[in-house]
């Protein structure tokens, strides 16, 4: 079986070429061809000796996930469904703005966590994505938009906020991050690459030590009682532990704050008292808040908070001195908004079946 070179960062690629009896600079050449020029064929790599190209064609490949579906929203947001084999597909979303272009990347086929307000969580879980399947989303997005990072940068920011919990696929995510940041890869700034987590505390500490990029925490609640219900991982890593991990992360973080993501659920976590509890909770954590109006999906059981409740919630936080943004919903007409990504998951957890049985019971 041929080796997929997209699975390697520069360090891994250098070792691979050493095993082939080649010099280290060859790894840099091939990495630039793959990621900066979008090459998918070794014969395109004209500064490699023909003998090396022949050897690579015999032993290796550049395997990119295949496109299953492409959609474009009325607001310019683009979504791609990529085939990762055995009936599974993952979704990648590009969000254009006047001052940046942000790509939202998936890390798993489905998600092993069961956040109750998230469409991905309802789909169950199949497997972790390989490093090639993660970085292949960035490769594909550039290709789909007709650009190469060497000549034109359309994607300025990457957020690991698509399908899956990135920290639960730690090693492959770190390899992909290494490629994103490498000057021979995509040359992105650590400040412009964000990993989102629901609060896997040990992995937060590991990421701080090996690949400190910007960090977003899917908080969504101001107390353990509510968070236990909507983010079950909280039962393992409660808020006190999570806040301590955030403080530790900031010691090496490229930004001097944590971004707390907070989905606004009507009647669940959107009252003035919740905002005041949040202020108390994050007293020792430099942070900003990103309030996310809930994006509905079929049979979710939740409603979006009213604009008035969101405004009051925001004002309480701002008056306490916090930077607060209310996320503008983008791409909801193509189910590309936050919490709507579902992809195509061959579930191994029986979670899809469980939710179907619950819905049938409710309808009966």
From Swiss-Prot:
Its EC number is 2.1.1.192. It comes from Neisseria meningitidis serogroup A / serotype 4A (strain DSM 15465 / Z2491). The gene is rlmN. It catalyses: adenosine(2503) in 23S rRNA + 2 reduced [2Fe-2S]-[ferredoxin] + 2 S-adenosyl-L-methionine = 2-methyladenosine(2503) in 23S rRNA + 5'-deoxyadenosine + L-methionine + 2 oxidized [2Fe-2S]-[ferredoxin] + S-adenosyl-L-homocysteine; adenosine(37) in tRNA + 2 reduced [2Fe-2S]-[ferredoxin] + 2 S-adenosyl-L-methionine = 2-methyladenosine(37) in tRNA + 5'-deoxyadenosine + L-methionine + 2 oxidized [2Fe-2S]-[ferredoxin] + S-adenosyl-L-homocysteine. PANTHER family: 23S RRNA METHYLTRANSFERASE (PTHR30544), RADICAL SAM CORE DOMAIN-CONTAINING PROTEIN (PTHR30544:SF5). This is Dual-specificity RNA methyltransferase RlmN. Belongs to the radical SAM superfamily. RlmN family. S-adenosyl-L-methionine binds at residues 164-165, 196, 218-220, 295. Disulfide bonds join 104-338. Its cofactor is [4Fe-4S] cluster. Its main location: cytoplasm. [4Fe-4S] cluster binds at residues 111, 115, 118. Reaction proceeds by a ping-pong mechanism involving intermediate methylation of a conserved cysteine residue. Residues 97-333 form the Radical SAM core domain. GO terms for molecular function: 4 iron, 4 sulfur cluster binding; metal ion binding; rRNA (adenine(2503)-C2-)-methyltransferase activity; rRNA binding; tRNA (adenine(37)-C2)-methyltransferase activity; tRNA binding. Binds 1 [4Fe-4S] cluster. The cluster is coordinated with 3 cysteines and an exchangeable S-adenosyl-L-methionine. The active site is at 91 (proton acceptor), 338 (s-methylcysteine intermediate). It is found in: Cytoplasm. Specifically methylates position 2 of adenine 2503 in 23S rRNA and position 2 of adenine 37 in tRNAs. m2A2503 modification seems to play a crucial role in the proofreading step occurring at the peptidyl transferase center and thus would serve to optimize ribosomal fidelity.
